[in-house]
A protein has these predicted regions:
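Short, highly selective alpha-helical patches that border small-molecule cofactor pockets
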Residues: 1, 46, 131-135
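Glycosyltransferases and closely related glycan-assembly transferases
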Residues: 47-53
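Eukaryotic N-terminal low-complexity, Ser/Thr- and Lys/Arg-rich leader segments
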Residues: 172-199
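The alpha/beta-hydrolase serine catalytic core
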Residues: 53-182
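Structural motif
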Residues: 15, 39, 121-125
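Gly/Ala-rich beta-loop-alpha elbow adjacent to hydrolase catalytic centers
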Residues: 37-47
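Active-site catalytic motif of lipid deacylating hydrolases and related acyltransferases
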Residues: 1-30, 149
């Protein structure tokens, strides 16, 4: 609804991270996307798809420990309907090990050019993933948004869409009239967004 001219490709990812990365890298080669957006585990994968503009939303860069700390072992129900019809997955210690090994590959090819291509959006009330500081060690374009781990429509409209629009404008050589307001103006004493940020 927000971007009627955009073609969105959102395949089901294999549960095993090596298979997921292979699928994603092949998609990048065949589809040549203008922008890749990934949330949570998808944000972790997105960071490693070098050479393309990317937005990592609440990226799970510590997926192995996130699984154990958030009590995600055993049977888990998918929160979104999958194209393959699968409803659940069994998370084992072996799978957690695979995720730990995959996350060790994050940030392996960060360059000054890559830093300009990657944006991080982090929910200020995310109870699951806390990787803002880790992301900021490697990339400078990171913000907190008012929200939790899952993206809701309000967060998409107020935070994700402006970043998408900014990237699209940059890619197309468009320049919009802009008034810049310091983030300090819209943050409380703890650096969290004030309610006025949503108005």
């Amino acid at each position: 609804d927000y971007m009627p001219q955009a073609t969105v490709i959102a395949p089901d990812l294999p549960i095993h991270p090596e298979e997921a990365m292979e699928l994603l890298r092949n998609l990048v080669k065949t589809e040549n996307p203008d922008l890749i957006i990934g949330t949570s585990m998808g944000g972790m994968y997105t960071e490693m798809l070098y050479g393309v503009d990317r937005i990592c939303v609440n990226p799970a860069f510590q997926m192995g420990s996130t699984i154990t700390e958030s009590n995600m072992m055993g049977k888990q129900v998918y929160q979104n309907e999958r194209q393959d019809g699968e409803k659940e997955v069994i998370v084992t210690k072996a799978l957690v090990k695979e995720y730990k090994e995959m996350t060790e590959q994050c940030f392996a090819q960060v360059t000054e050019e890559e830093q300009l291509k990657v944006f991080g959006l982090f929910g200020d009330e995310d109870p699951i993933v806390h990787t803002f500081d880790l992301f900021s060690e490697h990339y400078t374009q990171a913000i907190h948004f008012h929200g939790e781990h899952r993206l809701i429509e309000k967060a998409i409209f107020h935070y994700l869409m402006p970043v998408i629009r900014w990237i699209d404008d940059r890619q197309e050589g468009r320049e919009r009239r802009t008034v810049l307001i310091s983030q300090d103006t819209l943050a409380d004493g703890y650096g969290k967004p004030k309610s006025s940020l949503h108005k």
